[in-house]
Amino acid sequence: KERIIEYIGDSYTCGYGTESSNKERFKPETENQNLTYACAMARYFDADQIVVAHSGMGISRNYNGNVKGYFMPDRYLQTYDLVKDVKWDAKSFPLKPGITVIYLGTNDFSTGMQPAERLFVKNYITLLKEIKDNYGEDYPILCVAPKNDLLMFDYIRKALDSCGLKNVHIMALTKSVHNNDSDMGADGHPNYAGHLKKAHAMIPYVSTITGWELTGNEVK
């Protein structure tokens, strides 16, 4: 396809529990990336997607503090998910996305804890610079602040305010973006209905930033 969206995320972007109800625990067979906000938004814009996502990953703190010293800014540089020493050369790849959407931070603020602001901001800027190094100074990035902690928006905004980079944007998903009953799947993750609501919230931002016009397409 002519349009491509790159997504960088965690279990939400992986589709963790999208085929579950909120009364079920997670099972691998209920993970379906095709039912995420990312795929719904790509379908809306008739775009392909590049997905760099791994459950439990954060910017400066992984879920419950697991795997210290190795975060999504490290994993983003890899060609393979579990192979650290083979780096991805984006400049040699013939296709370039039109925008990168970062949807990270939930795990940083997981289990009732908050990451150190200075390290979070530092690592977030590192990720932004990695993306710019891949695609160019003027390349657009949309940073999405998840809904689980309002402080996260301030952390991400501070990273954007101090990074010195152009064409980097921010939006926030608040707790009202979806409900905690019929929109929820396994283990506190949204199901397909919840993901569609997230996609509806993000689509106007992507349209404005990229210049891709809103269409009459159904978000599905």
Tell where the protein language model's regions lie, with residue ranges.
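Conserved SGNH/GDSL esterase-like catalytic core that processes O-acyl groups on lipids
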Residues: 18, 23-115, 147-153, 189
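Catalytic His-Asp segment of secreted/periplasmic serine-dependent ester chemistry enzymes
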Residues: 146-220
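Surface-exposed acidic, glycine-flexible loop patches that form ligand/cofactor-binding
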Residues: 85-96, 131-135, 209-215
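Sec-exported extracytoplasmic/periplasmic mature domains
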Residues: 13, 46, 50, 105, ...
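N-terminal secretory targeting modules
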Residues: 1-8, 12-33, 210-220
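Generic structural signal for well-ordered alpha-helices
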Residues: 124-129, 157
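Structural recognition of the beta-strand scaffold that forms the well-ordered cores
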Residues: 4-8, 13, 49-53, 98-103, ...
